[in-house]
Amino acid sequence: MSVALQELGGGGNMVEYKRATLRDEDAPETPVEGGASPDAVEAGFRKRTSRLLGLHTQLELVLAGVSLLLAALLLGCLVALGVQYHRDPSHSTCLTEACIRVAGKILESLDRGVSPCEDFYQFSCGGWIRRNPLPDGRSRWNTFNSLWDQNQAILKHLLENTTFNSSSEAERKTQRFYLSCLQVERIEELGAQPLRDLIDKIGGWNVTGPWDQDNFMEVLKAVAGTYRATPFFTVYVSADSKSSNSNIIQVDQSGLFLPSRDYYLNRTANEKVLTAYLDYMEELGMLLGGQPTSTREQMRQVLELEIQLANITVPQDQRRDEEKIYHKMSIAELQALAPSMDWLEFLSFLLSPLELGDSEPVVVYGTDYLQQVSELINRTEPSVLNNYLIWNLVQKTTSSLDHRFESAQEKLLETLYGTKKSCTPRWQTCISNTDDALGFALGSLFVKATFDRQSKEIAEGMISEIRAAFEEALGHLVWMDEKTRQAAKEKADAIYDMIGFPDFILEPKELDDVYDGYEVSEDSFFQNMLNLYNFSAKVMADQLRKPPSRDQWSMTPQTVNAYYLPTKNEIVFPAGILQAPFYTCNHPKALNFGGIGVVMGHELTHAFDDQGREYDKEGNLRPWWQNESLAAFRNHTACIEEQYSQYQVNGEKLNGRQTLGENIADNGGLKAAYNAYKAWLRKHGEEQQLPAVGLTNHQLFFVGFAQVWCSVRTPESSHEGLVTDPHSPARFRVLGTLSNSRDFLRHFGCPVGSPMNSGQLCEVW
């Protein structure tokens, strides 16, 4: 399990946390009725000037004289201010180019028409929201998206360089993969044939033609093993939560195509989505050779099977206590639990050439689910099982086929997210695909082209300061007993941080070894993807008999994100996020602590959220809290859960339980970063203020934090986030966190009873 800062997009093994152009930023605001735009003022001035030069009336000459006098007085004031500034050794205002630029960006993002004590998110982001309408093809737009677009543009330039010549075979594979994705003419020429051939190789599909009726296990092994789809369940190799120095086979629930079980079960509210999904299933089936009438009926049966899976799928908010859902057993015991398939045969194929026996240990997350899946398989018609298994393969591979498949998907995405994927340039899609396939080789190119090594040293220093601030606050918690407090301090001390990138990516031999065995051709994008699935299966098998590597990264260097991994007790900050607006070396420290500092505090606090707190300093899942402190912790977190459950988006309430861990991390991260900033000021003295913004540096810290989360989103995407995302929506990551901050309320003078100060603060760390 990994915890990431912000969801950036769908899919993938990581919880993804998951951005505006210069043109959008420079676009003038639409003037309100009765107001004047900058253009209107400029036009009026020009008209008056032409009349002045043409008529020279006495009144106009007098006015001109007065204007010149006022201009002279203003110039005199500016000169006086300049003299005073140079005589002032403290130089309390920062007038460097960097300070002036960032002050301008902050000012254009603000909405001065809103009181910070009424709605701090609107105060901080109202201007940004006006200037940043959703770009075509996007269901949401924010700082993370903007920065990822910048990173993608850099990678595009590097990969399309005609003089590309690398000593690393892995880097050459990266360019070949990217170019194969760009070969649209070749992809169109092949059409659906590559997938048709693959389906025939596996044994056929009842939707499109003859199929082998007695090959359930063979099809399951091919679909879930060779091609890494996840029908019914997902199998992976990862660190054992209760013995984190060893890897183990793990099995968990899976098998739904739509983002959440809610889309299947709340059929009235999601009728449009379910209809669009069935239309999509039918269209893909026909593109692969199915007949209209029979295809729709067979795909309707697959959809009904997915609805039954949704019924037994455990909601994410009920899976937050890993102690309760962790079940270690042998393959023999797994066989007894879910006897509808041969688990030893399946896992032996999946992890070939390793030899497995009935006594091989497995961790199962959700025994009730697997038991019910087994019963569901037993009572389902073989033809429906075949259709469902091949459908899982189809949906995994169609993004590598011609435009007809993309057009079919676009209709579903528009219903699901309110956006059209076709608006996304092909090169951006190909950069994302390359990042998924050869992310660390791509990261090598990115780091060598962009990363300032000094950033790594500065980031390490900031982490130390934030860790110290967190531990100091730990010492003042009245609800925690001394034994638990000491253990918590030891865990905080033991948190391992990784910054920028893993060292191996800059060593060509080591980088090549990582991708050794992955064959990449410039001629066949579809085959490159199949080779990737097969290669990833082999990599997974290779990990089982090896101990987890402390220095193994779960995120590529160019990613705009960060994460905490409880089984390693480590926090990771890729190079992709160590940039403006999160961090810039020549910006005020208030902004850096409010940006990347809060990110660091957020990830550190994950070690002590409702899930991370179950792991000890060695990364093992075990009880290490005293009962009194645990009860007090739960009381404090209940306040957070209740608070966030009251927030609404488009009339739909947040799930305070589902978002609890991230909300704890947001609140704790802000507090740790602000305390670290105060400690920095005590050591270095007050820093210069930005010109024109009218904010103290303490206020600037909170504005900088809030503006990281400026965001726009379609209603459909907002709904999807509410039912799937462990993070609260951006607006409430700001409002919820700051309304619990005594420091924020003090520096902005928000009285009790104002919208930002209810008088009841929820505080855990």
From Swiss-Prot:
It is a single-pass type II membrane protein. Its EC number is 3.4.24.71. One of its GO terms (biological process) is protein processing. Keywords: Cytoplasmic vesicle, Disulfide bond, Glycoprotein, Golgi apparatus, Hydrolase, Membrane, Metal-binding, Metalloprotease, Protease, Signal-anchor, Transmembrane, Transmembrane helix, Zinc. One of its GO terms (molecular function) is metal ion binding. It is an enzyme of class 3 (hydrolase). Residues 82-765 are lumenal. It comes from the Eukaryota. Isoform ECE2-1 and isoform ECE2-2 are expressed in brain and adrenal gland. The active site is at E603, D666 (proton donor). It catalyses: Hydrolysis of the 21-Trp-|-Val-22 bond in big endothelin to form endothelin 1. Glycans are attached at N161, N165, N206, N266, N311, N378, N534, N627, N635. Its cofactor is Zn(2+). InterPro entries: MetalloPept_cat_dom_sf, Peptidase_M13, Peptidase_M13_C, Peptidase_M13_dom_2, Peptidase_M13_N. Zn(2+) binds at H602, H606, E662. It is found in: Golgi apparatus membrane; Cytoplasmic vesicle, Secretory vesicle membrane. The chain crosses the membrane at residues 61-81. Disulfide bonds join C94-C99, C117-C750, C125-C710, C181-C430, C639-C762. Residues 93-765 form the Peptidase M13 domain. One of its GO terms (cellular component) is cytoplasmic vesicle membrane. The keyword Acyltransferase does not apply. Its main location: Golgi. Residues 1-60 are cytoplasmic. Converts big endothelin-1 to endothelin-1. Also involved in the processing of various neuroendocrine peptides, including neurotensin, angiotensin I, substance P, proenkephalin-derived peptides, and prodynorphin-derived peptides. May play a role in amyloid-beta processing. This is Endothelin-converting enzyme 2. The gene is ECE2.
